[in-house]
Structures are given as C-alpha cells and as structure tokens.
Amino acid sequence: MQTSPLLESLMEALRCLPGVGPKSAQRMAFQLLQRDRSGGMRLAQSLTRAMSEIGHCADCRTFTEQEHCTICSNPRRQQNGQICVVESPADIHAIEQTGQFGGRYFVLMGHLSPMDGIGPGDIGLDLLEKRLETETISEVILATNPTVEGDATANYIGQMCGQYGVLASRIAHGVPVGGELEMVDGTTLSHSLAGRNPIKY
C-alpha cells in the first residue's frame, strides 16, 4: 500500500520510542492526524524545544535547562552531605517520589560494562571522584540497579569512596511488599535473608 511520504516519515520517527513497533506507530500517527492535530503541534513544539534546550546539570549530570538543576541548587540539599548515585535521571524521579531522601544525586547515565567497552570514564566516575575530593560528603548511597553490571559498578564506586574516607552504602534489595515467597526468584530471596532486620518491641 502506497501512503504519503510524510506519513511514512512520521510513523518511522515514532518508532524511535521504546516499545513502539510499526502498528503502534501507525495508531499514534493516525490518532494525531485524525483527532488531535493541536496536540500533535504541542508535542512537536515541546520536543523541538526540549531537544535543543535541555542539557545536563554541571554537578549531578541529570537533565536540566539550567547550568545547575533545582536539587543541586537547593541550599538545604547541599548541607545534607549525602549523595545518591543512580544509573539514570528516571531513577531520581522514582526516589524523589518516596520523599525519603534529602540529599543530592549523581547520575551515571549507565553502568560499567567491560564487554561493551564502557569504562569508568564513560559513566562520569572521574567527575564523581572530583566531588569526593573537593566536597564535604558524609555518605554515598549506591542505588544502581540490582544487576551484575549494577553490582559491579556499585563495588567500584564503593572502593573509590574508601580511598577518600567516605562512607558508602548500598540500597537494600529484597522481597517486594505484597509479594509471595514462592513467586520470588532465588537471588532476590538470598538478598532478603542476608539483609534481614531485627524486630524491635
């Protein structure tokens, strides 16, 4: 079937989004063109502006249109002394929603992966080391993903923190709230048993 070259181009562009295949891209394109052209224009304008204006925070490397993000610019956050290391800006959003962390962040934009040629310099560990050297940091909380690469990255950063006398801690991994033990994988259950907490009366 022959269609408009512009329509084909739109559908192909939409496929760059994660989880969007040919059918999903086609539905999105037809939805915008048939029922929500004003929404499509807003989307195009927001995308164009975001792609051209959003960069990285000079301190934590998260996404921001300023030199320093709002978290790093917050004096109360600066006085906290804690830095939480995460793999992506999306992880910051997830942690912020809990309301349990009042420090600052450092975004790796990935993890160590020698097989893929990703070393310490590729995920900004030189910048993190500079912060350890120049700032007063009381604790580095390692919130990398519970994967082989995430654990290796956390161990590497933990050793680096030790060189500067900075406490490094790893977020706990275990059985999810509301989960059933028989459905939990062995690795997660092992972490849960190793990280068990005493019951206080």
From Swiss-Prot:
Membership in a protein family: Belongs to the RecR family.
Name of the protein in question: Recombination protein RecR
Pfam family of the protein (one): RecR_C
Gene (name only): recR
Toprim domain: residues covered: 81-176
MF GO annotations: DNA binding; zinc ion binding
UniProt GO BP: DNA recombination; DNA repair
Function noted in UniProt: May play a role in DNA repair. It seems to be involved in an RecBC-independent recombinational process of DNA repair. It may act with RecF and RecO.
Zinc finger motifs (C4-type), residue ranges: 57-72
